[in-house]
């Protein structure tokens, strides 16, 4: 996402914020107190507040031994010369974050189906979880079936299937006479998400793409066709369609639902007080007390929607801990192009911590 569009999006966001006065402060206070906590040792632990510490026992697996990493995330194979980014561990201030135990994960999830639903950030998290499990249980038999939009990884000895359903917006994109239409109030593809024991959703980055990078020509809500609209408003409408689907279709005793949270980008060094820089060449996390760039605008929308949803949805609030990791992107070592990638994440790397948050929630 380019800087020009980020600035344009910021100005357009005023329309959304004028509709929800005090939204950012209220959401931050509410969710830092509730959704980011996990029950550990009989108390409540806030996993979202902490710092990155160097740990020589990391990474938890090797980029060269995990068979699931796509070239776009395999930064070492693509020639990245430094490895420090692999050795940082997230340490919450109030408690330790449990270390990943693949055998325990499999015992808890035996016979269950997990599905991650979203874009390439969901792919990032899916491949990380696959690598963590493979490293913990290297002799476990597995089968992998890749297709579009569904990829399935089954660990046969445990009856555990981890699915990835690729969708950029959660709501539908359909071909109509006018062209490709992003339908803000339609979610027919969600039939494929039924029957899961665990669902982890994600969507944000594609809502900000413009011009040739956006995979639609028009937006539609009801019978009204739009050439474009405020992207935060569109995102809010789309997420509300998803929330209605959750309310109407999820039985909490059968299915646990998570929202992956908003993954930040690091194209603009002004966000961490290094003007004119990007993620390229970064070798250390941001170590300050508070990230200068603040929270992404999408984070505000996510929290607004989750605050009103009737069914339980646990927010994996990975945003702040990920904002500190300006060093953890593929940058120029993405294996597929010469374009700078400050959006996705190297593996092993930051998404392993996302999965530690998930692991903590599933096993605590």
From Swiss-Prot:
Chain's role: May act as a bridging protein that binds pectin and other cell wall polysaccharides. Probably involved in maintaining esterification of pectins. May be involved in the specific O-acetylation of cell wall polymers.
Topology within the bilayer: Single-pass type II membrane protein
Intervals of motif DCXHWCLPGXXDXWN motif: 341-355
Stretches of the chain forming a coiled coil according to its record: none
Protein localization: Membrane
Transmembrane segments annotated in the record for this chain: 9-25
Entry GO terms, CC: membrane
Further remark: Contains 2 motifs that are conserved in esterases, but it is unlikely that this protein belongs to the catalytically active pectin esterases.
Keywords from the UniProt entry: Membrane, Signal-anchor, Transmembrane, Transmembrane helix
Main location group: membrane
Gene behind this protein: TBL40
Family label: Belongs to the PC-esterase family. TBL subfamily.
Protein name from the UniProt record: Protein trichome birefringence-like 40
Keyword 4Fe-4S in annotation: no
Span(s) of short sequence motif GDS motif: 118-120
InterPro entries membership: TBL, TBL_C, TBL_N
Molecular-function GO term, any one: O-acetyltransferase activity
Domain of life where this protein originates: Eukaryota
């Amino acid at each position: 996402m380019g800087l020009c569009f980020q600035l344009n999006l910021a100005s357009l966001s005023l329309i959304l914020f004028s509709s929800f006065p005090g939204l950012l402060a209220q959401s931050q206070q509410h969710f830092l107190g509730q959704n980011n906590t996990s029950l550990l040792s009989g108390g409540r632990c806030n996993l979202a507040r902490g710092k990155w510490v160097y740990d020589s026992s990391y990474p938890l697996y090797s980029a060269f031994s995990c068979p699931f990493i796509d070239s776009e995330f395999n930064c070492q194979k693509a020639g990245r010369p430094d490895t420090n980014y692999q050795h940082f561990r997230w340490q919450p201030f109030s408690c330790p974050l449990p270390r990943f135990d693949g055998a325990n994960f499999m015992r808890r999830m035996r016979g269950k189906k997990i599905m991650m639903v979203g874009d390439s950030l969901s792919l990032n998290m899916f491949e990380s979880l696959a690598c963590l499990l493979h490293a913990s249980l290297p002799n476990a038999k597995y089968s992998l079936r890749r297709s579009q939009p569904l990829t399935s990884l089954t660990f046969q000895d445990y009856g555990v299937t981890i699915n990835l359903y690729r969708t950029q917006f959660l709501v539908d994109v359909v071909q109509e006479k006018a062209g490709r239409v992003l339908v803000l109030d339609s979610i027919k593809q969600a039939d494929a998400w039924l029957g899961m024991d665990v669902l982890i959703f994600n969507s944000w980055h594609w809502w900000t793409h413009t011009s040739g990078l956006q995979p639609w020509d028009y937006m539609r809500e009801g019978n009204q066709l739009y050439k474009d609209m405020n992207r935060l408003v569109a995102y809010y409408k789309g997420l509300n369609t998803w929330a209605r689907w959750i309310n109407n279709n999820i039985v909490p005793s059968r299915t646990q639902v998570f929202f992956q949270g908003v993954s930040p980008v690091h194209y603009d060094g002004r966000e961490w007080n290094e003007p004119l820089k990007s993620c390229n060449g970064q070798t250390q996390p941001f170590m300050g007390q508070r990230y200068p760039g603040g929270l992404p605008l999408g984070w505000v929308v996510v929290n607004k929607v989750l605050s009103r949803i009737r069914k339980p949805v646990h927010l994996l609030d990975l945003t702040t801990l990920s904002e500190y990791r300006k060093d953890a992107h593929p940058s120029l070592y993405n294996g597929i192009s010469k374009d700078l990638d400050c959006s996705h994440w190297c593996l092993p790397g930051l998404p392993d911590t996302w999965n530690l948050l998930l692991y903590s929630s599933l096993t605590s």
